[in-house]
Amino acid sequence: MFALGSFKTFIGKCREDSVARNQMEAKCRLATAALLVRVATVDSDISEVRSKQLHRILRSRFGLDDSSATQLVEDAHAAERSAIDLYQFTRLLNRALDDKGRHQVVQMMWEMAYVEGRLNGFEANVIWRTADLLGVPSRQRVEMGQQIAAERSILASS
């Protein structure tokens, strides 16, 4: 009888851990999407090209269908509008992601910034501040940006 009770406790704990993990993943997706929205809108309203890129990034990186990506974008716009600063997003991502995950967030931001083939100072500043808050070294941040810029110029000339 004792073993059965312990097993039930173990199963209950596994379910709780699974729910908590799913909730944390959803929060990380929202925080990442909100940072991408910040990059996309920092200098103006979001253009159609940027909107499509935002959906594309979220679908490919998080394995979302169109409906889920659209809902995440709507939620991200609301979260970004109500945010006082970047810290509320980066604090969560720092707790939940390893170095590789934090680097991927910065890479997604570069992909968002360079979608139209150019980078402005506002976008660069948001990426710099976010990377700094995420603990991504300046050299790696710059290298990621240069790599994305090179890829964009190759695609644009093709």
Where are these regions (language model features)?
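Small-residue-enriched hydrophobic alpha-helices in membranes
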Residues: 1-38, 42, 47-158
